[in-house]
């Protein structure tokens, strides 16, 4: 299995279920999460809760490196991970991430793009992209700055060092840090509150806030130059080689 979908009352819960691969997002897992969100919309759910199995040691390690090594490092509108992230962002339903364990790389981006993130003290966050030199789109950097602030975003990207859950709370990546035994009840209380609010109003607020937060606010020529740099790095043999080398080291 890659993800489980459960409907309890007003909330749809999507559980990452790829523990043996540290819940790394391959095509199947990314599509399963996206399909679950679209199903929640179709069923009239009021909120989506995104979580992992309680026994998972890593909430998500981000992109599946095996697929990167096989297909190259892709970043286009139809790439499964990107489509999943955009669906989390663009669904009219509030998405709550319930995080009980460390998040890495693309897993941390999921925590960032979720509308509300509730974590436990064990939920450290590490952005490992620059250990391999994987670039992001301008809109992702804009969102990171909007969520965390410029200085903390630089620390995250330029050091690739883990942030404690408390640091994530203080910089805005997490909304709440609670004891492990309080994670489910805290999320349930949020869902109950969402149920009392007007769906159209919530959708408008979410869309408007994201439209502002994800906007880079740069001239077209600067955005074009950033896009060219981004594409050149993705196409470089060096990046493919670093991904392959990391995979080889993990197999030793």
Predicted regions, residues:
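C-terminal alpha-helix plus adjacent terminal tail
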Residues: 1-9, 40-43, 53-55, 160-166, ...
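Crotonase-fold acyl-CoA enzyme core
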Residues: 3-4, 86-200
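A structural preference for short, pocket-lining loop segments at secondary-structure junctions
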Residues: 9-17, 28-72, 87-97, 116, ...
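Hydrophobic/aromatic residues within transmembrane alpha-helices
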Residues: 14, 50, 64, 110-112, ...
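Glycine- and charged-residue-rich phosphate/anionic-cofactor binding loop of Rossmann-like
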Residues: 22
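Short, conserved glycine- and acidic-residue-centered signature motifs
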Residues: 26-29, 77, 104, 137
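Glycine-rich phosphate-binding loop at the start of an alpha helix
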Residues: 62, 78, 82, 105, ...
């Amino acid at each position: 299995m890659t993800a489980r979908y459960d409907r309890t009352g007003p909330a749809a819960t999507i559980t990452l279920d790829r523990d043996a691969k540290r819940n790394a997002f391959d095509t199947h897992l990314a599509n399963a999460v996206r399909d679950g969100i679209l199903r929640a919309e179709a069923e009239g759910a009021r909120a989506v809760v995104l979580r992992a199995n309680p026994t998972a040691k890593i909430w998500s390690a981000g992109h599946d490196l095996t697929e990167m090594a096989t297909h190259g490092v892709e970043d286009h509108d139809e790439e499964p991970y990107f489509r999943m992230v955009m669906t989390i962002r663009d669904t009219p339903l509030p998405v709550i991430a319930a995080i009980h364990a460390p998040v890495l790389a693309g897993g941390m981006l999921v925590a960032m793009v979720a509308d509300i993130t509730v974590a436990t003290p064990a939920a450290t966050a590490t952005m490992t992209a620059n250990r391999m030199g994987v670039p992001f789109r301008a809109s992702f950097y804009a969102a990171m700055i909007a969520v965390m602030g410029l200085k903390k975003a630089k620390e995250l990207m330029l050091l690739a060092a883990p942030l404690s859950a408390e640091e994530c709370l203080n910089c805005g990546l997490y909304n709440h840090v609670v004891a492990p035994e309080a994670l489910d009840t805290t999320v349930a209380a949020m869902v109950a509150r969402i149920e009392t609010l007007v769906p159209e109003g919530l959708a408008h607020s979410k869309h408007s806030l994201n439209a502002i937060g994800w906007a880079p606010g740069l001239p077209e020529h600067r955005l074009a130059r950033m896009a060219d740099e981004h594409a050149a790095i993705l196409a470089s043999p060096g990046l493919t080689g670093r991904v392959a080398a990391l995979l080889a080291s993990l197999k030793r």
